[in-house]
Amino acid sequence: MDKPPSNEALDKLDGVLSDLELCLADGDLEGARSALEAAQEMVGPGDPDVRFGRALIAQETGDAETAVRELKLALEADADFADAHYELGLIFEELEDTSSAVHHFLRTRALDARLDKERKLDDKAEVDRIERVARETIDALPTEFAERLRDVPILLEPRPSRTLVETGFDPRAFGLFEGPEHGRDDVPAPTRIVLYTSNLLANFADEELEEQVETTVMHEVGHYFGLDEDDMERLGLD
């Protein structure tokens, strides 16, 4: 029987797969394919992580069928592969298969939540930091906007609730602004800002965390003041 890979080999594999995702983020398909080949040489073409990488490349090229197949095969080998569940959820959402998307989003939420304590995502100092930056972001708005939002509560929750995810909401969202979505004078202030601390802390640290909290708050506030997704992308709030 083959020996399991060493920790050093696993770290090297993680690095290669991270390179693959960075290449895709930069639009470098050839670089991503080279990273995938390197990963295959290390652990074989049937490894769940390799299948995940292959699915990401397929998604980038518009081949949803291959992406779904590879992700399902990855989950056959590792049913608790949270990233594979999440990517499947996103694909099914795009294909307007809501029930399948929700199924995989719920699995993502459950699997992510298991790791919260292990990854120390409940650190009080970091959670307090998120709240502070969120309030500072609101207070720094021009007066006419800040005044309308000053009394809006900022609530911190680890992740979106199961009930919310059952509606198709992204289990890895960073925040939610509940209330009216058009900044008209004749509507009341929004109910609340919710920031999902575990999702933020799982992805960012230090200055990047503060920048993302600010972007998340501004994105949700933008909805309230009537900005659409194109407006927010143009302003760097997407």
Predicted region positions:
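Canonical positions in the second alpha-helix
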Residues: 39-40, 73-74, 108
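Structural marker of alpha-solenoid helical repeat scaffolds
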Residues: 42-43, 77, 94, 111, ...
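TPR alpha-solenoid repeat register
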Residues: 50, 84, 117-118
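Active-site scaffold of zinc-dependent metalloenzymes
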Residues: 176-214, 224-238
